[in-house]
A protein has these predicted regions:
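Short, charge-rich amphipathic alpha-helical segments embedded
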Residues: 34-59
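Short amphipathic alpha-helical heptad-repeat segments
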Residues: 6-18
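Short, charge-rich, low-complexity alpha-helical interaction segments
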Residues: 1-8, 60-67
Length: 67
């Protein structure tokens, strides 16, 4: 399997993990959201895509509310 093929597989897996994370959050399944968000972060780290974290705004809102 070539690096290009691996990148394509990881890109699809990243998209799926993001979709599942947002879907989980929209249904108040917070633990499941955390699971899929963590999967996304892990896949993003091992891929060469370096995508920006789609959950950053959620984290920033949580930090504001915490204070």
């Amino acid at each position: 399997m070539s690096l290009m093929e691996i990148d394509e597989l990881l890109a699809g897996d990243l998209d799926e993990a993001e979709r599942k994370a947002w879907d989980s959050l929209s249904r108040y399944k917070f633990m499941q959201f955390g699971y899929w968000a963590a999967i996304w972060v892990h896949l993003n780290r091992i891929s060469r895509s370096g995508r920006p974290n789609p959950f950053k705004r959620v984290v920033l809102v949580a930090r504001e509310r915490k204070a």
